[in-house]
Amino acid sequence: MILDAFRLDGKTALVTGARQGLGQGLASALAEAGADIAALDIGGVAETGGAVNACRRRFLPIACDLRKASPADLQAAVERVVSELGRLDILINNAGIIRRAPALEFSETDWDDVMHINLKAMFFLCQAAARNMAAQGSGKIINIASMLSFQGGILVPSYTASKSGVAGITRALANEWASKGINVNAIAPGYMATDNTAALRADPRRSVSILERIPAGRWGSPEDLKGAAVFLASSASDYLHGAVIPVDGGWLTR
């Protein structure tokens, strides 16, 4: 039956940035589909753990500050997932930050912080997970891109650079790892009602201009990403490699 292809029973997923918002929603979605969940964040993942446990799935919190994490730290996180939960089948690289300033005034510190979390840590976590997935002959990696993987944006040069990089690395890794049984794809969320967009939503003029361009007529929510995440994490997407799927209420069609 086709619906069985979307089940994740017996699978284990590692989700970064799972404390709240999109990451919490993604972790919950995979648990609802049957997966055990490891949540990597700086802390405070008890609420996410409660949602996972409510689905009668196992939950493993992993404390890690991606602003400072080295490739060795990320390799250790993957090894802990395998040691404590038995395997790693799915990685969702959701953790990310944004800094806003005009390009002429943008600081090196803000540039480096964004690039380290959004791009460098993402790549080396892909690498660490793929080493394990290649050995077992299968795996699903889902990177969280952005509309700014396709567009330039305003006042967010490092974020745009990092998310353009996420899309590029997703395609590059798909080229290398498809033959190893690893699917690497990405989801590009639109304007979501999360902490990253709080400043935009608090600006009445900017918020109205954004909503006027979205055919769906509303801000997105973590619930809107669940279907795409489960699809990409499941065997239903076995022939999909290197895709960057917009979930944006139609923003990119305008």
Residue ranges and their predicted role:
Residues 1-4, 151, 230, 241-254:
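Short C-terminal tail/terminal secondary-structure segment
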Residues 19-21:
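Conserved glycine-rich cofactor-binding loop
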Residues 106, 151-161, 172, 197:
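Active-site loop-to-helix junction immediately N-terminal to the catalytic Tyr of the SDR YXXXK motif
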Residues 131, 175-179, 238:
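Alpha-helical segment proximal to the catalytic Tyr-Lys
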Residues 146:
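Residue(s) in the substrate-gating loop at a strand-loop-helix junction
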